[in-house]
């Protein structure tokens, strides 16, 4: 098992963790339904970039 030769200082430890912060999700408003959604995803009604990608089938 690998063991560090020297103790990592508090400064270097914190610099290593500088990219670990939690960032909020980028939420956009759908142009067709007006609902909030994640970018680059198909909307609830089946549209993507203003075009119908698929049509939801009715449950039998």
Curated annotation (Swiss-Prot):
GO cellular component, one term: large ribosomal subunit
Keyword presence, Ribonucleoprotein: yes
GO BP term, pick one: translation
Keywords: Ribonucleoprotein, Ribosomal protein
GO MF annotation: an example: structural constituent of ribosome
Region (Disordered): 1-24
Ranges of biased composition (kind: Basic residues): 1-19
Alphabetical list of InterPro entries matching this protein: Ribosomal_bL32 (IPR002677), Ribosomal_bL32_bact (IPR044957), Ribosomal_zn-bd (IPR011332)
HAMAP family the record matches: Ribosomal_bL32
Family from the record: Belongs to the bacterial ribosomal protein bL32 family.
Name of protein: Large ribosomal subunit protein bL32
Organism phylogeny: Bacteria, Pseudomonadati, Pseudomonadota, Alphaproteobacteria, Rickettsiales
Gene label: rpmF
């Amino acid at each position: 098992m690998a063991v560090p030769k020297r103790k990592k200082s508090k400064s270097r430890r914190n610099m290593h963790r500088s990219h670990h912060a939690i960032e909020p999700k980028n939420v956009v408003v759908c142009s067709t339904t007006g609902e909030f959604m994640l970018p680059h995803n198909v909307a609830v009604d089946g549209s993507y970039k203003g075009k119908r990608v698929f049509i939801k089938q009715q449950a039998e």
